[in-house]
Amino acid sequence: MGQKVNPHGFRLGITTDFKSRWYADKLYKDYVKEDVAIRRMLTSGMERAGISKVEIERTRDRVRVDIHTARPGIVIGRRGAEADKIRGQLEKLTGKQVQLNILEVKSPETDAQLVAQAVAEQLSSRVSFRRAMRKSMQGTMKAGAKGIKIQCGGRLGGAEMSRSEFYREGRVPLHTLRANVDYGFFEAKTTFGRIGVKVWIYKGDVKNIAEVRAENAAARAGNRPARGGGNDRPARGGRGGERRGRKPQQQSAPAAEAPKAEAPAAAAPAESTGTEA
């Protein structure tokens, strides 16, 4: 299942969050259509800006749009002219007041959408698809990612029949829900047709919401537990040994040694009463 489904939708509420955050009852379909139009407008004319994702939040009379980009200078423009133009287009599209936030992506080498876009740009420039894939994989692994997988599908190298090829380096656990797997997709337009580029980047495990809340509560109380488990872990192992049917001689051996351990306590009764108190 994890091999087929979109990693973002597969992990919603666990390691990823919604890209559109609003509630609507009767206007739900209109808002969904509006969100699609906003994202299409922002990504169609700004291929050079390196837009990673667009987040949308709505209130009753205002729309907040967050643009995550690797090159914020291109989106803002000279003295903010381009940003004002985008804000005017969004207000005309939505009919509401728009709050536009332009956020810089700190590490574009580990952003799956930007990596897919970079590979697609090289394919459009007639670079060999294998060279483009390996170059992007090397840059991502040097940037600190734990694993990456890149897949290209289409008429690779101008072949008559379309096919798909992928390269993988490191670990990419698609079935593990706690794994922080970023996913990106972009299409390269070539003279032979379109080539789809898919990128999966594994950045490490992320704790789920329940574990984070429990850890925060323990930190406030001042008794944060150790990660390895509590003191009752050896006892659990002993019970498991009994269930598996260990020999009775192994269980009776500690009981035979118990009186030897109690001998010093009998010789010094004053000390034993002090410890009991």
From Swiss-Prot:
GO terms for cellular component: cytosolic small ribosomal subunit. Residues 216-277 are annotated as: Disordered. Residues 216-226, 253-271 have a biased composition (Low complexity). Keywords: Ribonucleoprotein, Ribosomal protein, RNA-binding, rRNA-binding. Residues 233-243 have a biased composition (Basic and acidic residues). PROSITE patterns: KH_TYPE_2, RIBOSOMAL_S3. Residues 38-106 form the KH type-2 domain. GO terms for molecular function: mRNA binding; rRNA binding; structural constituent of ribosome. The keyword RNA-binding applies. InterPro entries: KH_dom, KH_dom-like_a/b, KH_dom_type_2, KH_sf_prok-type, Ribosomal_S3_C_sf, Ribosomal_uS3_bac-typ, Ribosomal_uS3_C, Ribosomal_uS3_CS. The keyword RNA-binding applies. GO terms for biological process: translation. Belongs to the universal ribosomal protein uS3 family. Part of the 30S ribosomal subunit. Forms a tight complex with proteins S10 and S14. Binds the lower part of the 30S subunit head. Binds mRNA in the 70S ribosome, positioning it for translation. This is Small ribosomal subunit protein uS3. It comes from Streptomyces coelicolor (strain ATCC BAA-471 / A3(2) / M145). The lineage of its organism: Bacteria, Bacillati, Actinomycetota, Actinomycetes, Kitasatosporales. The gene is rpsC.
